[in-house]
From Swiss-Prot:
Family from the record: Belongs to the ABC transporter superfamily. Aliphatic sulfonates importer (TC 3.A.1.17.2) family.
Binding residues for ATP: 36-43
Pfam families linked: ABC_tran
Keywords: ATP-binding, Cell membrane, Membrane, Nucleotide-binding, Translocase, Transport
Subunit and interaction comment: The complex is composed of two ATP-binding proteins (SsuB), two transmembrane proteins (SsuC) and a solute-binding protein (SsuA).
Source organism superkingdom: Bacteria
Coiled coil: none
UniProt keyword annotation of Magnesium present: no
Gene field: ssuB2
Function description: Part of the ABC transporter complex SsuABC involved in aliphatic sulfonates import. Responsible for energy coupling to the transport system.
EC code(s) of this entry: 7.6.2.14
EC supergroup of this enzyme: translocase
Protein name as catalogued: Aliphatic sulfonates import ATP-binding protein SsuB 2
GO molecular function: ATP binding; ATP hydrolysis activity
Organism: Frankia alni (strain DSM 45986 / CECT 9034 / ACN14a)
Amino acid sequence: MGAVTVRGLRRAFGSHVVLDQLDLTIAESEFVALVGRSGGGKTTLLRTLAGLDPVAEGSVEVPALRSVVFQEPRLLPWRRVWQNVALGLPRSRGRDEATKALAEVGLADHARAWPLTLSGGEAQRVALARALVREPELLLLDEPFGALDALTRIHMHALVRQLHERHRPAVLLVTHDVDEALELADRVIVLRDGRLDEQIETRELFDDRRDPRFEQARARLLGLLGVTDTHVADPTATPSSAATAP
């Protein structure tokens, strides 16, 4: 059985149907990226899987242990960094586990810092530590790198890959960034007109973006999203800008 099983999910806001009889399965430890146009229902789906939005129609099966990382880190400014990570953990082991989680994301020396002293990338690493300290079976990422600069995004991508390999949760990443989706995910899905329109099994296609099939998959995804791409990639270069859906 998969970590996530969704059948016939429908969600509408007034007369606007956002999710239309949507079906989705995510296997245990699988990393799935979801791309689509703005307002197309990506975040609505993620919030439903997180239990933040109700299931009005259809069925949703998800693990009890799940965590969410949003674009904004949402740290409590009046609590120290380690206390933000330890929120909800038993007091007897909260500090030790928070410290270990911070070490995993390279912030062991920031445990007693205040959130307002952190850079954007550091704050998002704290949010990742907070999400993973509970060892979730499902990790939901809602455009977690969208507010970061290009260099910080590259570092965060590497960190997320390492953490996924170490902890092995199932992951759903919502993103507008096609390159990001292709580089991180085992499978990239396009959400269009409220349904999962098409998917690309990236793990079977290439190991890194220097493979020519990366550009082929990239062009295909951008075409599905209605984006005209004039970019010609240097396969030896690390991207400094993102190809994003409108």
